[in-house]
Amino acid sequence: MAKAPIRARKRVRKQVSDGVAHIHASFNNTIVTITDRQGNALGWATAGGSGFRGSRKSTPFAAQVAAERCADAVKEYGIKNLEVMVKGPGPGRESTIRALNAAGFRITNITDVTPIPHNGCRPPKKRRV
């Protein structure tokens, strides 16, 4: 008996008008994730995954490229407005927001959600170079 051909079902992308861009800017890398209002990830990109390795990974330009790639990944969802949440002290904080703005998103709100300890763990010792 011949098997019936299996048809690939086309996934329907849900349309989302508002999204949240989570930017994690560390000293070594920048991670950009765009989610819907409920927190479901729609797309993400990193500076390291965008082809930058080593010390070039921690540059504002690498963060800008990561933001552009993340914006391209979520274009099919129809997002128009973005709320931006920035975490971390890294060099990619500003350039990521500028790249998302240039990609055609309307940025409605920018929030800094960097975790600040209330005198928690002891920090590492100072570097001697």
UniProtKB/Swiss-Prot annotation:
Modified residues (N-methylalanine): 2
Gene3D superfamilies membership: Ribosomal protein S11 (3.30.420.80)
Molecular function terms, GO-annotated: small ribosomal subunit rRNA binding; structural constituent of ribosome
Leader sequence residues: none
Quaternary structure (record): Part of the 30S ribosomal subunit. Interacts with proteins uS7 and bS18. Cross-links to IF-3. In stalled ribosomes contacts ribosome rescue factor SmrB.
Family: Belongs to the universal ribosomal protein uS11 family.
Protein name per the record: Small ribosomal subunit protein uS11
Lineage: Bacteria, Pseudomonadati, Pseudomonadota, Gammaproteobacteria, Enterobacterales
